[in-house]
Amino acid sequence: MTILNHTLGFPRVGLRRELKKAQESYWAGNSTREELLAVGRELRARHWDQQKQAGIDLLPVGDFAWYDHVLTTSLLLGNVPARHQNKDGSVDIDTLFRIGRGRAPTGEPAAAAEMTKWFNTNYHYMVPEFVKGQQFKLTWTQLLEEVDEALALGHNVKPVLLGPVTWLWLGKVKGEQFDRLSLLNDILPVYQQVLAELAKRGIEWVQIDEPALVLELPQAWLDAYKPAYDALQGQVKLLLTTYFEGVTPNLDTITALPVQGLHVDLVHGKDDVVELHKRLPSDWLLSAGLINGRNVWRADLTEKYAQIKDIVGKRDLWVASSCSLLHSPIDLSVETRLDAEVKSWFAFALQKCHELALLRDVLNSGDTAALAEWSAPIQARRHSTRVHNPAVEKRLAAITAQDSQRANVYEVRAEAQRARFKLPAWPTTTIGSFPQTTEIRTLRLDFKKGNLDANNYRTGIAEHIRQAIVEQERLGLDVLVHGEAERNDMVEYFGEHLDGFVFTQNGWVQSYGSRCVKPPIVIGDVSRPAPITVEWAKYAQSLTDKPVKGMLTGPVTILCWSFPREDVSRETIAKQIALALRDEVADLEAAGIGIIQIDEPALREGLPLRRSDWDAYLQWGVEAFRINAAVAKDDTQIHTHMCYCEFNDIMDSIAALDADVITIETSRSDMELLESFEEFDYPNEIGPGVYDIHSPNVPSVEWIEALLKKAAKRIPAERLWVNPDCGLKTRGWPETRAALANMVQAAQNLRRG
């Protein structure tokens, strides 16, 4: 029984973000569709070849996406919302972009589809929309075309397809309500057709992703798997693929399915591989997800070998990444600024492929000598002074309940804040960032490269902050921001100023569409050597009589949007960050900043996938936020911002944050998120986002007024704020000015009654 290896997917964007650049050039009208498609072909060919050269046996095909793989699946099935359809009923790449962005080089603009987090990762998918009586047919043949490409290049191909039950689970019903699971029988013929086409091409194995099987699904959804897979059996071998958690709780459902193999995540799941081996049908292949696809740490291959060796030779076995390598940067070898010690601790996507090749070879040969050599840096790291800071550990151990309590309750604080700020009804503000123009990016890049000295850099940043204040005063906003010209990324910026983090040059991962992020890496205990945001906040406040918000990224979000350590708990990391940022709140307050926003957009996404594990996470997540904020005085107003969230199942925890004002993303969901706050009788102030910043479309005054009136039916008007959904970093100034002018006008109209 020869053991093979494979990956579940590979990063799409390219080492230098070639896909992002090609997408944005096409959207701006600076390149043709043919040029965009050519970049995709080139990236796919390069990535297949890189994996093959690194020693991967079975190459994933179908993991590439022009915007998002869930959206690709929606198009495959002919699931195109009416507002995004071409007049002739055809589907093309611009259809896909209209669903994702609200507009494309061709076709009429329309509201983009809702976007939300992919399970508990920092990747986003476009939510499929379902309407009653919907029809499905094979419409978008990207998967088949890419399989043909890979076969023509001589590769050993394993197509990747998002499974039918998970795809339905990820979607939402629009309009008249019905059970979306009732659509399952309508989409299965399309899946049958796709599998038949793959069989015609000589494909042996298809990776069919059903990550919903790691969730605590309702029984009706679990029951749907058997008839669905009965309908799909027989044409090719199916590798039922799960990730992000273990499968043991749903194993009875899984083992009843007519598939030929199962992939399990042995990094994030608690499954015992020997127990799995005993319970799986003896003729099934087991794909062991041993290499973490979601982090950057070198694997302890000695430990991985020990985890799997007892079933070697007892069943067909593949070794694999735990999940798609989409969530990992591409190549560590191009990182020239990391020192040798730290660099030796990491493995990016290509290095993970090498790990899989090494593990496969050792499992096949039985010669384990190479494993100890590979794992040696991991042993050295355990004793490194770069990792452990006794002062941080001592401060963390000394935290008391009092450290997470504001001095007084919200009602007392609100009175003090009203007296201090004297804001009008329907106060207007933005979420923090303003457009990151070419001039701003060039300024930062020149400074980073040493082409600009510190004085000239600071003069340039100060001028952009001044312009942001002028723009906001001209627009008539009530609470201002400094615009964050000095910040490349809301997490990276803080990580750069905190001890315990390191950074990469090219460690890009896709967040959504063309948006890429370069997460910091937490390598050790976290502390704040000096104030981070105080100087620029103080300068911005000196330019205006209106309040300017201090802007911090919260501890849970910094944790969730970084690559965390694996040698301590996430709770420990979050509380270390909270203590560092607590000092920042105190310093902002001392500098005269009266409104401080602590963004926690990632609070919900950090939830464990199983509800039974939620309480413990929410307890320490809320405590971390409160440790961060509780140092503030009564008349200092603490804001928090959350996006892409569904709140109704965590409202107790949202209220427990005890922020004075919460701003949330609601425009894409047509204010439906406010139902949670209404039903809970949320006591503090709320700013429901009134327009979608992910789309370049400018909302009308009437549209914004209508949303605010809808909000006021759920939340008392005296507790409502008026703001966009999210930061404006990715937008241009023309649409930003137009949208904010309409937003301010809508608020003024409502004040007049």
Swiss-Prot record:
Biological pathway: Amino-acid biosynthesis; L-methionine biosynthesis via de novo pathway; L-methionine from L-homocysteine (MetE route): step 1/1
Binding residues annotated for 5-methyltetrahydropteroyltri-L-glutamate, in chain numbering: 17-20, 117, 515-516, 561, 605
Cofactor note: Binds 1 zinc ion per subunit.
Domain of life: Bacteria
Keyword Coiled coil applies: no
Residues annotated as binding L-homocysteine: 431-433, 484, 599
Entry cofactors: Zn(2+)
Active-site residues from the entry: 694 (proton donor)
Gene3D superfamilies listed in its UniProt record: 3.20.20.210
UniProt keyword Iron-sulfur, yes or no: no
One biological process term in Gene Ontology: methionine biosynthetic process
Binding-site positions, L-methionine: 431-433, 484, 599
Annotated EC: 2.1.1.14
Record: residues binding Zn(2+): 641, 643, 665, 726
Record GO terms (molecular function): 5-methyltetrahydropteroyltriglutamate-homocysteine S-methyltransferase activity; zinc ion binding
Broad EC category: transferase
Residues annotated as transmembrane: none
Keywords noted in UniProt: Amino-acid biosynthesis, Metal-binding, Methionine biosynthesis, Methyltransferase, Repeat, Transferase, Zinc
Function comment: Catalyzes the transfer of a methyl group from 5-methyltetrahydrofolate to homocysteine resulting in methionine formation.
Family from the record: Belongs to the vitamin-B12 independent methionine synthase family.
Protein name (database record): 5-methyltetrahydropteroyltriglutamate--homocysteine methyltransferase
Organism for this UniProt entry: Shigella dysenteriae serotype 1 (strain Sd197)
